[in-house]
């Protein structure tokens, strides 16, 4: 039961249920809850006998021409009778989805006037199919369907009807004599069996993404009936080995009205060689993960008038590796509904997930999207918010959007929460990539050897150079903590090889070494933050580095102002809301350079304020004096002055950021989406903190006692090399570098 029950309900109701209701709207009173029933269900007051579809999302309001097109499609659905529906879970596991498909089909049959006994028999015989690669899982799914049938019809076991739920079998070791006996010299049977055997070779490796050629199935089954009473040594082998092959082949070859599944998630690097090669050969444009191949194949298994629904990782919505999959869905299908869950909501998986349903043909219509990314608390909270959105479309996290708009954004991400104004901005503005180079930095291959914190090296070392290496959320300036070995143009890095002679380092972007620009942490779990990058530094792979093609510092400051504004933190997650931001995401941000004329000065001021804050602590390589060293008589007075200084810096930076927000919101026309206000928690210079600052002051005092710092010299007084006693006139450092800690007073 890997997929949560309410998500199973959502998937089935918005695919199989939607298909039926669009052709038979008169059944909605029997199948859908009233407003009162929905409110009671959402509040937790549930009637055990209530089997209505509480997770069904009504279709978004459409333009008149779209409504006319949909009306023609609905006529096709209206011609369907319940016994004509074919539905499948091709990755059925223990049968959770199949069991709820059974319930929904029962409601459909009842609304159509069938008796319960007739409905149960028809569902098992005509409607429901399941496949799984695992034999035990398929047995459990078979059992689930049988128990569900028994729930509705107590005499079902006596009726001799078998579910179409199978474990995928492979033909690798089929008995040739049994095949010859079964075909009995019939050319058509021989051709059919040869094809099935060839196509199901290694089927256990590939599962239900196999494509199987349709055959004359009735002729094959007639032959099985014919040999049932035959007396031949190969009869039992043929029935035991060949019948499952034919059943699985037919199930794979059929086209379905609805496909609903939670496909396996497996990146290419974790696939076995056979599966990896198979997906490369058959799903080359969708090879990043097994789930993407399954989504495409499920579409191919579905009739043009049908629906598919899935529960998958949501990476396909945004990152470039899945752009081909997105384009397939945009151009060949119509996304009807999608729920994007909070990043860690689904604890059973190690990836952020979504669930979605699409119609297997393209119509220029709006779909319904739920954005639940801000609601922490696990899947129960996500369920409650889903029910809230179904009841109240004005909840703030329900959106209606056409996939045709997504192609206006570079990379075509599923940016369903973007406004029409922002889509127009993407279509009419230039992009950052037109004016700036965006690069990932070097990977050393051995950080312990080639990367150090700046305070781990000697003061005048010619081997080490400042290195930008990501870090915590901090805007404008800072996170200057590391140095990299780049002596003689990185000679040691370039000649460091593994046992096979391969260079361990990956030297990306080295043409931009020692170039002024902007840096940001590549991995970020919150808002993005950008900082100025000095011309004496090198970028490492944990950062994205941005360089103005003009090599003009003013252009760096203009873009830094934009990226650190609310525009940057609004648009970048549209392009990629995952924790891993790549250069292409930054290049794709829309920009109008000619309108960024009055922002570089504010950005410069913000960098100065952030540098003052960063350099106030020992962790900065440009630290000069501890800020509590002031010409006052008590620490309390010094702290009060320091507190005033910090507050002024904080308030000035906040005011500057709000002014920049106002400028950019006007440029981008997003007054309805964004406000200029900056929350205190998003201002990344520090306010005074008595406990922290006194502890830090004690640390500085210890540094003075040991000679690392001096009251007479700015910055580091000693970091190795020759000792200069003249630097310590006001306060002498300890001569032997040993200071006992005891109960007696140290100063006499």
Model segments located where?
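Class I S-adenosyl-L-methionine
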Residues: 1-79, 426-459, 463-467, 473-484, ...
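Short, contiguous acidic/charged loop-to-helix segments that flank catalytic cores in large enzymes
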Residues: 1-2, 279-290, 316-317, 344-346, ...
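SAM-dependent methyltransferase catalytic region
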Residues: 3-337, 361-368, 373-378, 384-390
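Carboxylate/His-rich catalytic cores and anion/metal-binding grooves
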Residues: 87, 247-261, 463, 481, ...
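Structured core elements
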Residues: 89-91, 98, 130, 258-260, ...
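Short, glycine-/Ser/Thr-/acidic-enriched flexible segments
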Residues: 92-95, 135, 172, 264-266, ...
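Polynucleotide-recognition surfaces of large bacterial nucleic-acid defense/processing enzymes
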Residues: 142-144, 152-256, 331-336, 344-502, ...
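Basic, amphipathic alpha-helical recognition segments used for DNA target recognition
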Residues: 362-363, 521-588, 595-609
């Amino acid at each position: 039961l890997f997929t949560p029950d309410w998500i199973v309900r959502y998937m089935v109701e918005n695919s199989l249920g939607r298909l039926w209701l669009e052709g038979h709207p008169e059944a909605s009173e029997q199948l859908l809850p009233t407003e009162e029933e929905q409110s009671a269900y959402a509040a937790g007051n549930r009637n055990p006998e209530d089997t209505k579809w509480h997770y069904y999302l009504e279709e978004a309001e459409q333009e008149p021409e779209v409504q006319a097109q949909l009306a023609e499609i609905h006529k096709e659905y209206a011609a369907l009778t319940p016994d004509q529906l074919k539905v499948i879970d091709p990755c059925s596991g223990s049968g959770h989805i199949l069991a709820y498909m059974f319930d929904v089909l029962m409601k459909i049959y009842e609304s159509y006037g069938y008796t319960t006994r007739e409905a149960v028999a028809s569902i098992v015989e005509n409607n429901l199919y399941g496949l799984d690669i695992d034999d035990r899982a398929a047995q459990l799914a078979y059992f689930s369907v049988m128990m569900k049938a028994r729930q509705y019809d107590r005499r079902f076991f006596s009726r001799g009807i078998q579910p179409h739920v199978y474990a995928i079998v492979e033909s690798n070791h089929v008995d040739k004599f049994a095949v010859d006996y079964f075909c009995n010299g019939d050319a058509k049977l021989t051709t059919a069996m040869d094809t099935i055997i060839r196509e199901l070779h290694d089927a256990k490796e590939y599962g239900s993404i196999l494509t199987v050629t349709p055959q004359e199935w009735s002729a094959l089954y007639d032959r099985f009936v014919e040999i049932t009473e035959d007396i031949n040594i190969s009869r039992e082998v043929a029935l035991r080995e060949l019948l499952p092959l034919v059943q699985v082949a037919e199930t794979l070859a059929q086209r379905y009205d609805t496909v609903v599944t939670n496909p396996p998630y497996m990146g290419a690097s974790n696939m076995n060689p056979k599966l990896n090669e198979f997906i490369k050969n058959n799903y080359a444009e969708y090879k990043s993960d097994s789930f993407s191949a399954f989504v495409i194949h499920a579409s191919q298994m579905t009739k043009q008038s049908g629906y598919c629904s899935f529960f998958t990782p949501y990476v396909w919505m945004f990152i470039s590796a899945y752009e081909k999959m997105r384009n397939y869905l945009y151009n060949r299908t119509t996304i009807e509904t999608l729920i994007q869950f909070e990043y860690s909501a689904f604890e059973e998986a190690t990836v952020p997930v979504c669930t979605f349903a699409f119609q297997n043909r393209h119509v220029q219509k709006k779909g319904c999207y739920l954005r639940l990314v801000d609601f922490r608390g696990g899947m129960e909270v996500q369920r409650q918010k889903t029910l809230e959105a179904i009841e109240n479309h004005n909840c703030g996290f329900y959106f209606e959007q056409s996939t045709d708009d997504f192609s206006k954004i570079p990379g075509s991400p599923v940016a369903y929460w973007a406004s029409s104004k922002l889509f127009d901005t993407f279509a009419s503005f230039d992009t950052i990539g037109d004016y700036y180079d965006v690069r990932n930095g070097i990977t050393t291959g051995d950080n312990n050897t080639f990367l150090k914190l700046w305070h781990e090296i000697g003061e005048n070392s010619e081997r080490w150079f400042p290195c930008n290496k990501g870090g915590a959320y901090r805007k404008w300036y800072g996170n200057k903590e590391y140095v990299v070995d780049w002596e003689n143009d990185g000679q040691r890095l370039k000649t460091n090889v593994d046992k096979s002679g391969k260079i361990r380092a990956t030297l990306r972007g080295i043409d931009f070494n020692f170039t002024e620009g902007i840096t940001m942490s590549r991995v970020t779990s919150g808002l993005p933050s950008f900082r100025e990058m000095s011309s004496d530094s090198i970028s490492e792979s944990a950062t994205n580095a941005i360089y103005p093609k003009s090599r003009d510092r003013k252009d760096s400051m203009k873009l830094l102002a934009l990226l650190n504004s609310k525009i940057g933190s609004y648009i970048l997650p549209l392009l990629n809301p995952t924790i891993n931001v790549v250069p292409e995401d930054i290049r794709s941000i829309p920009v109008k350079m000619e309108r960024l004329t009055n922002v570089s000065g504010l950005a410069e001021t913000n960098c100065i304020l952030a540098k003052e804050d960063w350099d106030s602590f020992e962790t900065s390589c440009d630290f000069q004096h501890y800020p509590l060293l002031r010409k006052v008589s008590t620490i309390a007075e010094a702290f009060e002055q320091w507190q005033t200084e910090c507050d002024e810096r904080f308030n000035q930076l906040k005011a500057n950021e709000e002014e920049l927000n106002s400028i950019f919101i006007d440029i981008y026309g997003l007054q309805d989406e964004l406000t200029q206000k900056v929350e205190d928690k998003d201002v990344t210079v520090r306010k005074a903190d008595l406990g922290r600052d006194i502890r830090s002051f004690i640390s500085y005092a210890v540094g003075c006692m040991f000679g690392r710092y001096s009251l007479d010299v700015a910055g580091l007084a000693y970091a190795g090399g020759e000792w200069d006693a003249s630097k310590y006139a006001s306060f002498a450092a300890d001569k032997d570098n040993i200071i006992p800690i005891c109960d007696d007073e140290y100063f006499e």
